[in-house]
């Protein structure tokens, strides 16, 4: 069955984007370097098939937008089977007692900003050619009260997260930086 759709100006295609299409990420995100610098909590099968299908039918992807993605800060976890998990930090950075810093130890954004604005600030604060990485810092009390990322609040133990390196513990900022 053939169906037609007509539009006066544009069609918005909601097909999940292209979080796991390395070539398109490289083309659309100037800061992405080799295209592998982004981790997405989106399904790994979400490789932009819908966009490519639309392009074969004559569709055009708007590539002049200042932001071609919905950015979200994530952390990477290692699962028991050795595969990697991607943990989105939608609200973690805005929890009481949490601050975010770049590798140089400097705060770069208001942690309460939207996750999209937060990641834009993180990208802007990174030095050219440097991996875009930030760290969420909190004290023991905040961690146990609110949790952080894949670390649940008290009474769940912290051992696993400390042993895998997902959490780092130190009594000074210098210890945390090691």
Task: Name each model feature, range by range.
Residues 51-177:
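An anion/pyrophosphate-binding glycine-rich loop and adjacent beta-alpha core
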Residues 1-5:
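A structured beta-alpha segment of the ubiquitous adenosine-cofactor-binding alpha/beta core
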């Amino acid at each position: 069955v053939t169906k037609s759709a007509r539009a006066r100006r544009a069609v918005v295609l909601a097909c999940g984007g292209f979080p796991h299409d390395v070539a398109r990420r490289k083309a659309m995100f100037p800061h992405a370097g080799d295209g592998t610098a982004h981790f997405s909590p989106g399904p790994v099968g979400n490789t932009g098939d819908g966009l490519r299908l639309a392009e074969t039918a004559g569709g055009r992807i708007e590539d002049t937008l200042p932001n071609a993605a919905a950015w979200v800060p994530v952390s990477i976890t290692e699962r028991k089977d050795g595969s990697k998990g991607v943990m989105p930090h939608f609200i973690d950075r805005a929890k009481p007692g949490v601050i975010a810093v770049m590798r140089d130890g400097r705060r770069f954004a208001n942690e309460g900003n939207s996750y999209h604005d937060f990641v834009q600030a993180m990208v802007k604060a990174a030095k050219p050619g440097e991996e875009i990485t930030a760290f969420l810092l909190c004290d023991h009390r905040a961690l146990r009260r609110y949790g952080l990322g894949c670390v649940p609040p008290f009474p769940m133990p912290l051992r696993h997260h400390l042993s895998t390196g997902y959490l780092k513990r130190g009594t000074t900022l210098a210890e945390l930086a090691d």
